[in-house]
C-alpha cells in the first residue's frame, strides 16, 4: 500500500507523504467486525464444533440453504418462498429479500459433517462499505466486469474530501483496491481543509462557536460568502472563519 501511495498525486503533497504516508507505514491490522445491529452482516457461519463457511454470493447462500433444507436443519428456503431468483439482478427481484439482521440470523446452514451452523452475529465495519464503493456501485464482480478489469471506470481520476478522511475513506478505498486489484483506487486526491472558528478551534454546538452557514448566506449573499471562502485560504488549508473579515 505504501508503494502504491507514491503513485498518487496528492494536493497538498504533504498529506500524502506525511499524514497518510505515516499512517500506512505504521498500519495495524484492520479489525473488520463490529458489535452492532444495523449494518452489513458478516457472511460467516459457524458450527458449535468450530466448522466455518464464508459465503461469497447470494447464489451460494441460496444453494447452501437448499442443502440445509435437505439435511433437516431448515424447514424451507426463505429466499425461494419470497420468489427470489438467483442470477436475476433486477431491482424488482432484490426487493423481495432482506439479508440484514434479524432476518439473516434466522438462516441455519449445514456443515460438512451435518452440524447446524449459525451466523456470526457481528457486522462489518461501515468503512468497509465505503471503501468498497468503486466495486459495489456497479455490482462487481457479478456484473460489469469490464468496467474494472479493463479500467474503464477504475481507478477514479480524483477524489476530494476533508483531511480527516486520511484514516477513513482515503484509507479504506486504498486498502480494498490494493487487496482486490493490487491497484490504487484513485489517481489523485484533493484533500480539503476544515472550516474552524476565528480562533482556529473546531466548531461545536457544545462550545457554542458554530456558525450557521444559512444565516451568513442570507445576510451577505452566496457569492460574497464564496469569495470569502476562496480568498482567505487555499482549498487544502484550514480556514479560520471570522464574520468580521
Where are these regions (language model features)?
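Structured secondary-structure scaffolds
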Residues: 1-245
Amino acid at each position: 500500500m505504501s508503494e502504491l501511495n507514491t503513485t498518487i498525486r496528492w494536493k497538498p503533497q504533504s498529506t500524502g507523504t506525511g499524514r497518510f504516508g505515516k499512517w500506512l507505514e505504521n498500519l495495524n491490522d484492520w479489525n473488520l467486525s463490529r458489535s452492532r445491529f444495523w449494518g452489513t452482516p458478516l457472511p460467516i457461519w459457524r458450527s458449535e464444533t468450530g466448522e466455518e463457511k464464508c459465503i461469497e454470493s447470494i447464489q451460494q447462500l441460496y444453494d447452501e440453504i437448499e442443502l440445509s433444507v435437505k439435511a433437516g436443519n431448515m424447514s424451507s428456503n426463505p429466499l425461494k418462498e419470497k420468489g427470489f431468483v438467483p442470477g436475476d439482478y433486477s431491482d424488482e427481484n432484490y426487493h423481495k429479500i432482506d439479508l440484514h439482521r434479524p432476518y439473516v440470523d434466522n438462516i441455519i446452514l449445514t456443515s460438512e459433517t451435518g452440524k447446524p451452523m449459525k451466523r456470526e452475529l457481528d457486522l462489518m465495519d461501515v468503512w468497509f462499505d465505503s471503501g468498497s464503493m468503486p466495486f459495489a456501485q456497479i455490482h462487481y464482480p457479478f456484473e460489469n466486469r469490464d468496467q474494472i478489469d479493463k479500467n474503464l471506470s477504475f481507478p477514479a481520476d480524483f477524489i476530494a474530501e476533508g483531511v480527516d478522511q486520511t484514516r477513513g475513506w482515503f484509507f479504506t478505498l486504498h486498502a480494498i483496491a490494493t487487496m482486490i486489484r493490487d491497484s490504487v483506487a484513485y489517481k489523485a486526491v484533493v484533500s480539503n481543509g476544515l472550516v474552524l472558528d476565528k480562533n482556529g478551534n473546531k466548531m461545536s454546538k457544545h462550545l457554542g462557536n458554530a456558525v450557521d452557514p444559512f444565516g451568513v448566506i442570507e445576510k451577505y449573499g452566496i457569492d460574497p460568502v464564496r469569495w470569502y471562502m476562496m480568498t482567505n485560504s487555499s482549498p487544502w488549508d484550514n480556514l479560520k472563519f471570522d464574520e468580521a473579515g
